[in-house]
Amino acid sequence: KENLSLSDFSSLIGYSLLTAKDLCRIKDITPDLSDLIRNELPKYREINEFVKTIKNPSLTTGRIKRSFFQCLFDIEKEEPVMPYLRVLGMKKEASSLLSQKENASCQILTKLAFDVPKMDDTAKKLFAKDLLASDLYRQVFCHKYNQTLPNEYQHSPIVL
């Protein structure tokens, strides 16, 4: 099975770091990490190499990578809590639980074309970031493997 690696997103992440106006507003990026990124950014060639360049004892590799993707998707420190849940799959015997989704404390997405128009503006803004992440993944995958993948509106939850 084909997979993508961090290096497949190297150019996109490099671009997002170069064009970010204020890295400190990005979730998980502290002023110290922002300064480190800005100081080392002129040397940026490839993402894995850049992670090694800025890694230090107070920064884990995972945190650095996560902060880079948060920059790519413009996830700010003050983002609201996710106001919806998305069903990706379920067991057939559990599908009856979906009839209770009207009573849920947050919106449960099963059919995007039907559910997204019902979202409030905050949820739609956050969902747009989900779509961007999915679309970028799909685009990078298609470019690397010369295959197409369905977009988020073209597939339903998997029933096992």
Each language-model region and where it sits:
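Non-catalytic terminal extensions that flank enzyme cores
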Residues: 1-160
